[in-house]
A protein has these predicted regions:
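Terminal-appendage/accessory-domain detector
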Residues: 1-6, 102-115, 122-349
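N-terminal core-entry segment
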Residues: 1-164, 174, 209, 349
Length: 349
């Protein structure tokens, strides 16, 4: 995801490019162009768009998708302009509350964003047009969404490369769960805590993350678990990591849900003051028999440029090419053959 914009450019831009059937090397420049367009629009409206209640990927993903496909096909400026305008007519207006309610259909909005960008290009090629000023004026899309796009503002960077602050998720789960997951692993490494002796867990964090404080019900639907700070924290504290295998077998581990029900999430004024530049969280664990609670704080930033796949935090090391390859192989184990895994690693290296 793009830390400075709250969006996930890969999920809306890569599907259309990969579906084109072109050689991977031919997709690199169009991908970068698509990333830059959607990222800069996202950055210009972040975190206001999220706080207003909408998902940045659904809003700005179609624009990036359309521009990337136009770049791939070397379309003329007139086609690009109309494709962008059409993509801003009725993009999938993803409601952020659906993420917080753990609605399992939510991941589909990435695909809708990708498809709408592709459709916009087809319509533009056919001669259809969009608005002359799709991003400005009263009742434009930004106006209706309650955000502003001032292209003279310092918040909109027209130089530099936003792609350098698009980072790989180092672990399974919503990005807003990651600070708490890191805290859980740090606790597991530093203190041998008897899980059943834990009486309560208090996590203090920024306001947006409060929306991910629900505990999954007894069904433990997959998306609900991935979007739950209590569940992700508990799974990491018990097992040290959330793996595809653990997700598959989650019903065999009722202790995760039992611990998750003891987790409470609170707003921290300090963490809120640092959001969105960094995703900060503090945890306090009350353990039976211990006079004082166990306390740790995590500072996790995705806003600074790095050539790594994920920057370091207080408890997690930086995520380089070797770490990414190792993680990929580990996640593929038991899902696809070792031979196919190595082929994919060689293909994308």
């Amino acid at each position: 995801g793009y830390g400075n914009g709250g969006n996930h450019p890969s999920s809306s831009i890569l599907p259309g490019l990969l579906a084109s059937g072109n050689a991977l090397n031919d997709l690199v420049l169009p991908m970068i162009v698509g990333y830059e367009i959607s990222n800069r629009l996202s950055a210009a409206t972040h975190p206001r768009l999220t706080r207003t209640g909408f998902t940045p990927t659904a809003i700005w993903g179609p624009v990036g998708s359309a521009v990337a496909l136009c770049k791939l096909a070397e379309e003329p400026y007139s086609c690009i302009r109309q494709a962008v305008a059409i993509s801003l007519f009725c993009p999938p207006i993803g409601l952020f509350s659906y993420l917080q309610e753990m609605v399992s259909a939510v991941p589909q909005h990435h695909g809708w964003a990708a498809r709408f960008g592709s459709d916009a290009v087809h319509l533009s090629r056919a001669g259809l047009n969009g608005s002359d000023n799709p991003l400005g004026g009263q009742k434009s899309l930004p106006d209706l969404l309650g955000v502003e796009l001032n292209f003279g503002s310092p918040s909109i960077e027209l130089d530099g490369e936003t792609i350098k602050t698009v980072y790989t998720k180092r672990e399974i789960g919503c990005r807003h769960c990651h600070p708490s997951a890191a805290l859980a692993r740090a606790l597991k490494k530093s203190r041998q805590v008897e899980i059943e002796a834990i009486e309560s867990v208090d996590i203090s964090t920024y306001k947006v993350a409060l929306g991910f404080s629900k505990v999954p019900d007894e069904r433990q639907e997959l998306y609900a678990c991935l979007m739950s700070i209590p569940w992700i924290f508990s799974a990491n504290l018990i097992f040290g990591e959330v793996t595809p295998h653990l997700l598959t077998d989650r019903f065999r581990h009722p202790e995760i849900l039992r611990l998750a029900k003891k987790v409470q999430i609170y707003e921290s004024s300090d963490a809120e003051a640092h959001y969105p530049l960094s995703l900060n969280s503090e945890v306090s664990v009350k353990v039976l028999g211990l006079r004082e609670s166990l306390k740790l704080a995590e500072v996790m930033s995705y806003s600074s440029e790095s050539d790594l796949f994920a920057p370091e935090s207080l408890f997690d090391p930086a995520f380089g090419a070797d770490e990414l390859t190792s993680k990929f192989k580990k996640n593929c184990a038991g899902v696809i053959s070792e031979k196919d895994t190595h082929s994919l690693v060689n293909l994308y290296s």
